[in-house]
Amino acid sequence: MSSTKLISLIVSITFFLTLQCSMAQTVVKASYWFPASEFPVTDIDSSLFTHLFCAFADLNSQTNQVTVSSANQPKFSTFTQTVQRRNPSVKTLLSIGGGIADKTAYASMASNPTSRKSFIDSSIRVARSYGFHGLDLDWEYPSSATEMTNFGTLLREWRSAVVAEASSSGKPRLLLAAAVFYSNNYYSVLYPVSAVASSLDWVNLMAYDFYGPGWSRVTGPPAALFDPSNAGPSGDAGTRSWIQAGLPAKKAVLGFPYYGYAWRLTNANSHSYYAPTTGAAISPDGSIGYGQIRKFIVDNGATTVYNSTVVGDYCYAGTNWIGYDDNQSIVTKVRYAKQRGLLGYFSWHVGADDNSGLSRAASQAWDATTATTRTIQKV
């Protein structure tokens, strides 16, 4: 090989490696927004975030293509431009699916090479046409070993497609993320961690909805970071399970809620965690946004309690009891994430915050926390 060709090759390789390194995420401070929250995009303080998710695009079960409903098109098409007014460097991702999406449609799509290609190609087209910097898949949840295998195949093909599209278009590669169960073990069905780690830029660990009146007859911490008994769900247990299964810590993003759940106590004098209840309070399913919780506390003179053992808050007034995360819980979780070497944190959802109070506390806590060597080791 001539010296000229050798130099050219070295330059090309160096450029490629530099490009790949430059695309590696250094931190994720994120939140989701969705139109039904009725929270104006213009009110998002994007200076508090590195990434914002716009939710949700849909999957057409007949064509297996990603679509945006006509009702959402105006807000989705201007989302990136709007949030970048306050923070030109914030990255946006189009989130596909969601908790109420038909999971059987995703299982069917992922089971066939042709339908996977339809999903992948259309997702890239939609992301580019709407000006998003990436894509996020919220399939809740692959529920069998076969579905998990197909999920892994989908992710690998998705990654190959966005790399190829970036090469052909000359544009920066689209980011790829996924919202996943808090643990890598979904009721004895294991996520394909190798495919997840090699294909996605990061995963959002949904470490919340552990307790709620729809599935728990007693009060409990909806998003406990720790469970002293080591028998129940917690953010720490879920994070450890993912990392011990092989997910790099720097691809894990810890999630927490900007909402809580309200129960009606059976006995107003029994108001701690795991107190008996008669069902949901305040709203039909008991869900209540953080801003509404703050108002409830003031309007009712509610007693507030922070539990440092589980890292969670609750308040009560009469027979109304609410479990949630306040500033201290959020800050503690953010510190946990950084000290253990995680990539960052995300919240659901930005519209439920109270004047950006939780988002501001989270961002400041991350910046003020020093990463330590207390990383979670793979076994």
From Swiss-Prot:
Annotated EC: 3.2.1.14, 3.2.1.200
Gene Ontology MF, one: chitinase activity
Annotated positions binding chitin: 99, 259, 348
Pathway(s) where this gene product acts: Glycan degradation; chitin degradation
Classification via Pfam families: Glyco_hydro_18 (PF00704)
InterPro entries reported for this sequence: Chitinase_II/V-like_cat, Chitinase_insertion_sf, Glyco_hydro18_cat, Glycoside_hydrolase_SF, Glycosyl_Hydrlase_18
Keyword Nucleotide-binding: no
A Gene Ontology biological process term: polysaccharide catabolic process
Inducing or repressing factors: Induced by jasmonic acid (JA), abscisic acid (ABA) and salt (NaCl).
Family: Belongs to the glycosyl hydrolase 18 family. Chitinase class V subfamily.
Protein name: Class V chitinase
Organism listed in the record: Arabidopsis thaliana
Upper lineage: Eukaryota, Viridiplantae, Streptophyta, Embryophyta, Tracheophyta
